[in-house]
Every structure is written in structure tokens, then in C-alpha cells.
């Protein structure tokens, strides 16, 4: 059968079709011919065609059996009956039990964290649990603490969104009105003190917001985390669990982490060890870098289905209020009386524009002055420095919004860089 005509795949109950696309410009079309199937918790509509492009790693699961029609060039494609989906749906059922109790007693719904090393399917499990919750009428919050590969905002930030409808099969959840906090590094190790401060602030604001809507209050929060699970990374997980008051922690594919958490979290917290899916693929450093770049590119330019058209404009150095969070470390003996070396980690420091600023992504803070709580203030969006002209004392910014910058705009430096070679 030719690649253009495609092929029908018959899946038995509790099995899934997995495929990967690695070749650029390749696209794969999938449609559900009969039966019932879902992609990471989102039900497929019968006879509707779904399109997947380069980088897609897809697992279409069926509880009752189905026939799928697939056409296009795939690097890997196979059916597997070895899937952890039944365990994942059991986790949803347990969370749903907590939600029903919370609804009856007007309490907070379950706060569940998904933890594990890199490349075990943490964000996928979050997506499955959120989709299942929405499908039974819940409105949970999704908090993403993974600053390396964020699924809500661009890397270098932590973010929360309200989930009101299932994720789009091809594009994921709608990113409407996210609450985003600037961190500015690709790993919590970039500034551990700042990372904990930002996570604490987002947890505080998010938990307060649950009170404004009864349905969301009982629906609870699903939290995605970084893949750094040893040493300081483990300490960050404990910090997040405490800040959010997590009642359940789902540990993917690592017994050591599971046992450490059993030992260290309060007695009432349910710690559950889960297998990772056999379809999870390890990503190289290069692939991670590409994924970060792609997220930033999509922030400014959208995608083929919904393209954006960003603006480029000049800002004079004198009009640029640019700051960085975290000053170079000093020994305690050199610090002012009453200050510790770690206080420097959260200090807001002015940045003088130089050619080194080129390609850096900057966050636009809602804070209007450095006297405000800059760390504890969320950001409105991002821009990117595409040019630095020392002669004319000006920078060129790529921005989703036209000129000028808002009055009193306070920009925050990030180590993230984006080469804008979009044509």
C-alpha cells in the first residue's frame, strides 16, 4: 500500500498506536474510522482528520478497541499493548474521589504533583489527568514549574492556567490568560534562592485564586515539575510540595525518588509510584535546545494554523528600564550589616545595555518600579533584543505588541536567547 493512500490500524482494547516524526516537512494525517480512541486524554472525533508534524511523538490509546487510518511518513510506527494508561486512569479516579469530598465540604480540591527524572512523560501525565478532569465537568488549575521545557509559557518562567476544556489534539491546551512569573534561567540551579521565591509566590497567588470560584476550588491543581530530582533539585521538589500543600505526589519511573519522598513528606501525603510509558522518548541536549527555540518562535510568530505577525521597533537606551534579578555573589563579610550572601540572589540590579544583550529574551513586568515587589509580580509578556546600536544608543526589540513600550515599562533580563531568523 502506498504512503499516500495510508493504512488502517486495528487496535484491540487497552492498546495504543505509537508513532514518531523526525523528518522536517514531514506530516502525518490520522483519522478515527470506528470505535473510540484518545490522545493523552482528549477524545478523537470520528472521521475528523488530525495533522502532526516534525517532532511529534504520538500515542493514541483505546479502552474499547478502534480502527485508525494513518497516512504520511513516520520514522517509527507500532501498536503496543504494554501501556500504563489503566494505572493513570486509576490516579484520575482517586483524585476525583478527593474532588467529590471537597465539593461536599466546600474545601480545596486535591493538589497533585507529578515528579520524576527527565524524559519519563511528566507533562504528558499532567495533560492526561487534566483532560480527564475536564471531561467530568471539573475546572482544574495547571501549574508548570519546569523552567527548562515549559508547556504554558516560554522557558525561564513558571506559569499557571485554568483548564476549562480538553486539550486540542494537535496543539495542546489553550494558553488563555496565563499567570506567568519570570525566573530568567533554564534550570533552577541558575539561581536556587530565586526559584524557590518565585514558586512560593505563584503557589500563594494560585491557592488564593481558588477561593474566587467554587468549581475550580474543588477541582484542585495539577503541578508539573522539573526533571532535576537529586541534591538541590530534590530540595526544590520538597519546597514546592510544601508551598502548594500537595496531597498527592505521582512519581514516574524512579523508585529511589519514591522512597525518598515517602521518608520526607508529611504522613498525610499520598506518594504513588507509576511506570512510565514505553512510548516515552529520550531527548538529547540538542533536541531540548531546539524545543526551547521552537516555543519562543511560536510565542512571537505563532504556527502554520494560527500565524502571528510581531512588531520590530527601536528603543533608546535612555528609555530602557532594564534590570536583572540576582547580583554576583559576595562573601558574608562583605555584605551590609543584617544581610546574608543569599539576599544578593534576589537583588534587583540595573543592566547597562551593551552588544552582549543581543538575542536575549526580556520579560515585561507588571511592576512599575524597582521599589515594587519585582520578584512577586507577574509578567505581561516577552520581547527579544534583535539589535544593539552603541553609536545611536538604541536597541531594536521584537515584540508581540506595537510600539511604544507601556509607560514605566520595567524589563527583566533572561539568559534565554533567540536568534530571530524568521523570513
Curated annotation (Swiss-Prot):
What's this protein's function? Required for endonucleolytic cleavage during polyadenylation-dependent pre-mRNA 3'-end formation.
Organism field: Drosophila melanogaster (Fruit fly)
Subcellular localization(s) per the UniProt record: Nucleus
- Give the main localization category: nucleus
Q: What is this protein called?
A: Protein CLP1 homolog
Instruction: State whether keyword Aminoacyl-tRNA synthetase applies.
Output: no
This protein's record includes keyword ATP-binding = yes
According to its UniProt entry, the protein's GO biological process terms are:
mRNA 3'-end processing; tRNA splicing, via endonucleolytic cleavage and ligation
Q: Which residues bind ATP?
A: 16, 57, 119-124
What Gene3D superfamilies does the record point to?
Clp1, DNA binding domain (2.60.120.1030), P-loop containing nucleotide triphosphate hydrolases (3.40.50.300), Pre-mRNA cleavage complex subunit Clp1, C-terminal domain (2.40.30.330)
Q: Which SUPFAM superfamilies match?
A: P-loop containing nucleoside triphosphate hydrolases
The record's GO molecular-function terms, alphabetically, read: ATP binding; ATP-dependent polydeoxyribonucleotide 5'-hydroxyl-kinase activity; ATP-dependent polyribonucleotide 5'-hydroxyl-kinase activity; polynucleotide 5'-hydroxyl-kinase activity
Q: Which UniProt keywords apply?
A: ATP-binding, mRNA processing, Nucleotide-binding, Nucleus
A cellular component annotation (GO) from this entry: nucleus
Please give the family membership noted in the entry.
Belongs to the Clp1 family. Clp1 subfamily.
Amino acid at each position: 500500500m502506498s504512503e499516500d493512500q495510508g493504512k488502517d490500524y486495528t487496535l484491540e482494547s487497552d492498546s495504543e498506536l505509537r508513532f514518531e516524526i523526525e523528518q522536517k516537512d514531514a506530516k502525518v494525517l490520522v483519522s478515527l474510522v470506528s470505535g473510540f480512541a484518545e490522545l493523552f486524554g482528549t477524545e478523537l472525533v470520528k472521521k475528523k482528520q488530525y495533522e502532526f508534524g516534525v517532532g511529534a511523538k504520538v500515542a493514541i490509546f483505546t479502552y474499547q478497541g478502534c480502527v485508525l487510518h494513518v497516512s504520511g511518513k513516520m520514522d517509527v510506527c507500532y501498536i503496543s499493548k504494554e501501556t500504563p494508561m489503566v494505572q493513570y486512569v486509576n490516579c484520575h479516579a482517586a483524585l476525583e474521589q478527593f474532588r467529590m469530598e471537597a465539593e461536599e465540604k466546600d474545601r480545596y480540591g486535591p493538589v497533585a504533583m507529578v515528579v520524576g527524572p527527565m524524559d519519563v512523560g511528566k507533562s504528558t501525565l499532567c495533560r492526561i489527568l487534566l483532560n480527564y478532569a475536564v471531561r467530568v465537568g471539573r475546572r482544574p488549575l495547571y501549574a508548570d514549574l519546569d523552567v527548562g521545557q515549559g508547556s504554558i509559557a516560554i522557558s525561564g518562567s513558571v506559569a499557571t492556567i485554568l483548564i476549562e476544556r480538553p486539550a486540542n489534539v494537535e496543539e495542546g491546551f489553550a494558553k488563555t490568560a496565563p499567570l506567568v512569573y519570570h525566573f530568567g534561567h533554564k534550570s533552577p540551579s541558575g539561581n536556587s534562592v530565586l526559584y524557590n521565591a518565585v514558586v512560593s509566590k505563584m503557589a500563594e497567588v494560585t491557592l488564593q485564586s481558588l477561593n474566587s470560584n467554587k468549581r475550580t476550588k474543588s477541582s484542585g491543581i495539577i503541578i508539573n515539575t522539573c526533571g532535576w530530582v537529586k541534591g538541590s533539585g530534590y530540595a526544590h521538589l520538597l519546597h514546592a510540595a510544601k508551598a502548594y500543600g500537595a496531597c498527592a505526589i505521582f512519581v514516574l519511573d524512579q523508585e529511589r525518588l519514591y522512597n525518598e519522598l515517602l521518608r520526607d513528606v508529611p504522613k498525610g501525603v499520598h506518594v504513588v509510584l507509576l511506570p512510565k510509558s514505553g512510548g516515552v522518548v529520550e531527548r538529547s541536549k540538542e533536541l531540548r535546545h531546539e524545543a526551547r527555540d521552537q516555543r519562543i518562535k511560536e510565542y512571537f510568530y505563532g504556527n502554520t494554523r494560527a500565524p502571528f505577525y510581531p512588531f520590530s521597533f527601536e528603543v533608546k537606551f535612555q528609555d530602557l528600564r532594564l534590570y536583572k534579578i540576582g547580583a554576583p555573589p559576595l562573601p558574608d563579610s562583605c555584605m551590609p550589616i543584617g544581610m546574608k550572601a543569599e539576599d544578593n540572589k534576589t537583588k534587583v540590579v540595573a543592566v547597562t545595555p551593551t552588544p552582549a544583550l543581543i538575542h536575549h529574551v526580556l520579560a515585561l513586568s507588571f511592576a512599575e518600579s524597582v521599589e515594587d515587589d519585582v520578584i512577586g509580580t507577574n509578567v505581561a509578556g516577552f520581547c527579544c533584543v534583535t539589535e544593539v546600536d552603541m553609536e545611536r544608543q538604541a536597541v531594536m526589540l521584537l515584540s508581540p505588541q506595537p510600539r511604544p513600550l507601556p509607560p514605566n515599562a520595567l524589563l527583566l533580563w533572561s539568559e534565554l536567547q533567540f536568534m530571530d531568523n524568521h523570513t
